[in-house]
């Protein structure tokens, strides 16, 4: 678990510091290569989500969990700043007409959105086990990052709900946007 958290942080640092410098050259080349570079972070966070479901995994790596809480906090800030720029549905023609630079930008936003939503689950799993965690972990979550306070605007904004181009409500579930015809089904 600690190795995955370390890999996640290294990937985030690469994405934040190196990717902006190489994205234009990546756009000129093979698009699958650039997508896989961006998707690595999503793969690692997915593995961590599965592991964090289990109390033993959280308890085993309490020192690294502090770094994971900081990571999730940064993703929550990104999600709050997203506003109306959340991933939109595109027609096939729109996707074909995109330049490589626009395609990379769209993929980047979609992947980052998915990662941020997964971070909500991870924080929930950590929160469920607060009584079993040491004081520095609880302090990081409740005092330093003030996770409960940052979740309130996210719950009010509901970035996991969008209206598609047809005016229908969609909810982000299971790593994809799903149409919800019944208003009762929308959280």
What are these regions (language model features)?
Residues 1-186:
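Long, leucine/valine-rich, helix-dominated scaffolding and oligomerization segments
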